[in-house]
Amino acid sequence: MATDGASCEPDFSRAPEDAAGATAEAAKQDFDVDALSKSELRMLLSVMEGELEARDLVIEALRARRKEVFIQERYGRFNLNDPFLALQRDYEAGAGDKEKKPVCANPLSILEAVMAHCRKMQERMSTQLAAAESRQKKLEMEKLQLQALELEHKKLAARLEEERGKNKHVVLMLVKECKQLSGRVIEEAQKLEDVMAKLDEEKKKTSALEEELSTEKRRSTDMEAQMEKQLSEFDTEREQLRAKLHREEAHTADLKEEIDKMKKMIEQLKRGSDSKPSLSLPRKTKDRRLVSISVGTEGPMTRSVACQTDPVIESTDHVKKLPLTVPVKPSTGSPLVSANAKGNACTSAALVRPGIDRQASHGDLIGSSLPTVPPPSATRVEENGPSTDSAPDLTNSTPPVPSSTAPPAMQTPGAAPQSHSQAPLHSLHSPSANASLHPGLNPRIQAARFRFQGNANDPDQNGNTTQSPPSRDVSPTSRDNLVAKQLARNTVTQALSRFTGPPAGAPPRHGVPPSGDVGTYPPVGRTNVKTPGVARVDRGNPPPIPPKKPGLSQAPSPPHPQLKVVMDSSRAPSAGAKVDNKTVASPPSSLPPGNRVINEENLPKPTTPQLPPKPSIDLTVAPAGCAVSALATSQVGAWPAETPGLNQPACSERSLVIPTTIAFCSSINPVSASSCRAGASDSLLVTASGWSPSLTFLLMSGGPAPLAGRPTLLQQAAAQGNVTLLSMLLNEEGLDINYSCEDGHSALYSAAKNGHTDCVRLLLNAEAQVDAADKNGFTPLCAAAAQGHFKCVELLTAYDADINHTADGGQTPLYLACKNGNKECIKLLLEAGSDRSVKTSDGWTPLHAAVDTGNVDSVKLLMYHSAPARGHFLHEEEPESGVCGLDGGEGSPEGTAKPVVPADLINQADREGWTAAHIAASKGFKNCLEILCRHAGLEPDRREKCNRTVHDVATDDCKHLLENLHAFKIPLRISVGEVQPDIYCSDDFECENTICILNIRKQTSWDDFSKAVSQALTNHFQAISSDGWWSLEDVTCNNTADSSIGLGASSVRSVTLGNVPWSVGQSFAQSPWDFLRKNKAEQVSVLLSGPQEGCLSSVTYASLIPLQVLQNYLRLVEQYHNVIFHGPEGSLQNYIAHQLALCMKHRQIAAGFSCEIVRAQVDASFSKEQLADLFISSACLIPVKQSPVNKKIIIILENLEKSSMSELLGDFLAPLENRSPESPCTFHKGNGTSGCYYFHEHCFLMGTVAKACLQGSDLLVQQHFRWVQLRWDGEPMQSLLPRFLRRRAVNKFRGQVPSPCDPGCKAVDWAAAVWRQLNSCLTRLGTPEALLGPKYFLSCPVIPGHAQVTVKWMCKLWNAVIAPRVQEAILSRASVERHAGFAQTTAKKTPSQGQQAVVKAALSILLNKAVLHGCPLPRAELDQHTADFKGGSFPLSIVSSYNCCSKKKGENGTWRKVSTSPRKKSGHFSSPTWNKPDLNEEGIRNTTTSQLNCNRNASLSKQKSLENDLSSTLTLDQKLYLGSDDEADLIKELQSMCSSKSESDISKIADSRDDLRRFDSSRNNPTFSATVNNLRMPVSEKEVSPLSSHQTTECNDSKSKTESGVSRVKSFLPVPQSKATLCSQNTKRSSSSSNTRQIEINNNSKEEIWNLHKNEQVEKPNK
């Protein structure tokens, strides 16, 4: 039957083939396959394929059915479990019932079929086994190949090390050459410094010699001046004696003449003549001989023009009739002054006050031919400076006066006729005229002039004058004598002028203050010509350059003679008025018109005891009302500065004075100002000058003198600030104190304009008119306000001056003060209640004037200063209601107070339609415009007459201000929502960061607002994710959709405007301006998508880990279920795990699953039973009999490094991989029970390990988890810290990317560099357990403009975190090596001295190399912080002085201590961190320290030096030893710390000497040597920079020769000191955890020994 079944199978197997063939034949008959299209072919193939599949199914079904029928028929009656029993039953049944036939043909065939099947299966299994064996053999062959490759790799590695050694040797040679070159450079620099020092010394010597030379010059000048002074005094005395002789001779001649006359009179009396009434005695007529000729109101008068060398011209008067017996003496007149000369005379003023000649009778005057009086148009003197068409001649100008205006000379008997044109007329500006203006004139010379000019009228002790004989009738002899005596007197004056004037050709000196001044004047508008030879040296002034000798001087006589008026009819013709012989001259034309009154205090001399001490005044020409001087004894105030004021002069448009007369009997020479009646009686001046009062009666003997000249003098005193003179004039009765000149200037006006407060007070007390205006309408208050005299303004307002008075042009005092920017005056006027709204004729208000000048303070006062109650500000210097803080400080009023001016005044337009804002904008006064814009009522859209707005006329800066005028500034901030990372301190992490300030204007639309928000976010993300300090322009130019960290506008979840939610692109009915104002939104907050939305954008922004990296981590967790994050401590492992768990939780919740997060802190006491309970309680471990729960669990095991992971997780590794009920495991609970459990399929396990690398048994766990390594030198950790600190800086700068030059930015870059350099050094040091993540540096403070705070923070971090970790890592490594080397069971509680030395050396290296390198602080500031760092004072030369000797001989390595100053004790290097155990005697004996004598003292043996060392205090810093060889490996680690990777940095370190900080524990400490005999490892190049920061001195042994001893400073390169053979063959291998490569060096290798210290001295030790 088996054969039948077998035969049937082929039939069925062929059935599908037959069917397919039939179908194909039918298809060929029906259609042609080649003619079908592609779609029809596809359809045909699919139909045929379906038929084939259906046929196969039918065949299989028929076969199965046939097989079932066959078995049922054959074995249906039997149990087929055991075929042998069935076979036995068949036989039994067959024996019993032979008639029955068995169903099966042969049961044995069935058994054979079964056995054949078994054999087939056995063959198949053998085949598979053979294949497995072949695979195993192949695997073994691969292993052999791998071993061969490893051997080859080792060979290559060894060859590579050899090449590195060769390269290192080459580098050492190059470094040696570099060091030599650097030494040469230092020598050249030292030479250059010496040369520069010598040059400085030479310069100092030269300057000292120059000072001595100048001192000698001054001394010689003083001596020469004194000699000149003595010569001039001698000349003066000679001329005095000569003049006295001439006077005596003249007097003798007069007496003879008088005798003759008396004889004639006796004869006449005898004859009984009737002429007695007409011949009166001189004493009777003496009091009537002084004639005062009035001007302006009287009839025409002749002018007498004469020089002292010219014939005398008689002048007559037709108006004032005198008796016939009164003769009038011809007087010396004033020269005519040209129209272009500066003067101050009124138009109709005659300039001469003629005296009375006793020799001429009235009949002679009448009988004489009278000259024609020139018309006013011809004699008028131009006022207020020269005319526009002619300028004054400064040398020798002759005025263009027509000959008809000159009075003809009268012919007198005996007098030579001389025309007026022959007299040289000089301008007042000529140097010759100026030459006689000598305020510093020698008092003896002045006395001589007084003596010769007024000796006949000198008062005696009783105040009486010497009297002359009575007058005689006119005779030719007397006229001749008159001319002769006049010539004699002129000759004396000419002689005196020769040495009182300057040398010929000497120009006048401008701006030199007179030595006799008491008041201090600025040199504005001032010119004074001093006599160089006789300056007042007692005032402290340096002696001037001496003039030429008077005897050699060729200066001509003064062309403008002294004007003298005869006072007494009884005088001799040769006697003149007693006046101060000082010629009046005007200043040069370059000066502004103004009276110059120069105070000179003349001290009495022993040679002239008859002259009492009296002040003398020289008057120069200036406009009346503008003279600014006073008596030296009564000077009040200072010369007012030349400030912008009124456009017109003080008096009128043309107002200058011509000096015409000299006051009688006084040292004061007043100029007649605006009046020609200055010749009136000056009794007040006589009294003021200190002369006897009896002279007043004598001077006024001609009758009562009118007060017409008094107002002029009053104005002069007020303008000059002469308080004494002014008070005397005010006490005079009948004086009109309100008198004003032609221009309307009163005395009060002049005093107020020139700022003489005391004069203003005197005039106001005298009831002067306070509001008297000039012809232009300006009052004294206007003048004071315009000139800025706020004291005068205060006085005038106190006396109820009209503060709102308007001049002819509408100018008020407030307007004038604003126009000139006088802040104090504006303040006083506003407090007095001045009206701000008064307009001028041009429509300008005071606000227009203030803005026009651009004075911000004036504008602020007008805008914000309110007027207090009237009358309370007079005695308050600073009213409390006034404006404070005009400089814009914290007290600035515009920030708190509201403007007091109305909107109408702000928008007031002038005649052209311009407002104050138009003026400020057009002139570019941005500050003024900003103040105006703060007023709510300002209308910037107001148009002027040309239809232009403020914006149209504004400059670019002002346009920008106007465009942002009404911008609503609102901050845009980013919020990270619920992301509150536990890795950040609360103070270090900002939940919200201000990224920019949005300017919302009225015309801003919602589309613009959306674009602005999106653009701001994009720029911010680009800025914080960039590699450097990008500016916003760079960010905009580099604009992309997303930043490098994956954030963009799509990362925003929502935006809130204040408290109202808003999304980008959304619009409201109101504009953004109105919406934000209405809702009082203070900020715009942007919330990023976070884990709640199943997104990681907020986590990316908070941690600054790129979004793609976080998404990759999340994918790993979801895919592998078991993930561990590991990295150095502080690498944010816990934070990343927690945030990923949150994101997964919210994703599962969104998918409809419940999810739970379980966090567990693992410590050393955490057992696997507790972990099992945790898994069971969180439904992570499920009992076998229990069905799994429908929720997902996320378990986070934090800090797994604190326990043994192999012990803790060992029992859970297999169940974690096979999570199903089929593979349960038995776990023990914490309560002692146990059970079978399996892990939930949807359980996620995450762990965190704060360890850089795994060691030992923990490696067994590694293959069962997916590990995510967070390396400090790879992404994402490498860029996290710079990005985080950069974002903090942007937040501190209010969203603006700061400049890289900012100290705060430099501190940020430095902090990030410290973190990288520190980890780099720790890696090479072989202490990976001391590596730090960026967490500790995230708290770095960022303060704009300051870096000191960052340095202090770094010091605290170093002392609290970094230094303890480094110490612990190095000591733990040392203890591990000690345990491995000597199998010690107990570790020392305190580290050995060698270990402490290694720790200190490591800290010093790290501090100098990693932390302080590149600090942004200057060297001086950084030195102040170095003492606060731990480990910065360790002498690194000790590290390299360790000698490694053979272990077999039992010799220990020693620390050699060398001190150049054995008297100095220890303590130069402080190390407060570690304990210093006292060394016992045995330990001391074990130390074989030897002292090397730098002074070549070879007599001391090593034993004595050792005993000397032991007798002194033994400290850890100076005397260190190593008791075993394990410290040698640590020293080896230190020396090879910077071996290979830092070779390229040596040039960088050597060049950046400013960045390299050296820390000396003491500036004057003895330094240490580094003499090395045997050392196994060289010091690498990069180790140089920190090691060279300590002062060491190289000392040789007693036989070596030291070099010059000059220390070479500022050397950054190590110098190989000696070649030494290294005796150690066996070097210890470092632990497996060390990343530092150790090199085995044989006995014959030679290495360079590095000498590393600050002051390097290269010495060659004896071999």
Curated annotation (Swiss-Prot):
Superkingdom per UniProt: Eukaryota
Biased composition regions of type Low complexity, renumbered to the chain: 1624-1638
Compartments where located: Cytoplasm, Cell cortex; Cell projection, Dendritic spine
Record's keyword terms, sorted: ANK repeat, Cell projection, Coiled coil, Cytoplasm, Methylation, Phosphoprotein, Repeat, Synapse
Region (Disordered): 1-26, 203-225, 359-440, 454-478, 497-615, 1449-1490, 1579-1663
Pro residues bias (residue ranges): 606-615
Chain intervals with Polar residues compositional bias: 385-396, 418-435, 1586-1595
Modified residues (Asymmetric dimethylarginine): R498
Disulfide bond residue pairs: none
Coiled coil location: 119-276
Name this protein carries in UniProt: Cortactin-binding protein 2
Gene that specifies this protein: CTTNBP2
